[in-house]
Curated annotation (Swiss-Prot):
The gene is uspA. CDD domains: USP-A-like (cd23657). This is Universal stress protein A. Homodimer. Gene3D superfamilies: HUPs. One of its GO terms (cellular component) is cytoplasm.
Length: 144
């Protein structure tokens, strides 16, 4: 099956390059579009009123770092990137919204194979939320 628009969900870890390479290898033969997306957690949900944290400054700094990292991934992809998206909130809902808006038909995401990922896998959440084809790529941390 030839996909027309592939969405790569990245966490901006060094392993994100593996996902981009995998998606490019699938897109190139069919001249499919590729887009990148990164979803930040909503930091205001993590902090209570008991902790004095300037969330506005923190989110601006993180947003700037996210933009830089996405731009770098896009530039080094070796293939045209149609959209570079960044969102915050519920991962599944943000992806569903992007899929509908940009008419995407495949999501490529990674799954870290460590203890915590087995307990709290975002890939598992996506399987129950996203209603297009998915490719879940097993990732190993670089130091392994």
């Amino acid at each position: 099956m030839a996909y027309k628009h592939i969405l790569i969900a990245v966490d901006l870890s060094p392993e994100s390059k593996v996902l981009v390479e995998k998606a490019v290898s699938m897109a190139r033969p069919y001249n499919a579009k590729i887009s990148l997306i990164h979803v930040d957690v909503n930091y205001s949900d993590l902090y209570t009123g008991l902790i004095d944290v300037n969330l506005g400054d923190m989110q601006k700094r993180i947003s700037k770092e996210t933009h830089h990292a996405l731009t770098e991934l896009s530039t080094n992809a070796g293939y045209p990137i149609t959209e570079t998206l960044s969102g915050s909130g519920d991962l599944g809902q943000v992806l569903v919204d992007a899929i509908k808006k940009y008419d995407m038909d495949l999501v490529v995401c990674g799954h870290h194979q460590d203890f915590w990922s087995k307990l709290m896998s975002s890939a598992r959440q996506l399987i129950n939320t996203v209603h297009v084809d998915m490719l879940i790529v097993p990732l190993r941390d670089e130091e392994e």
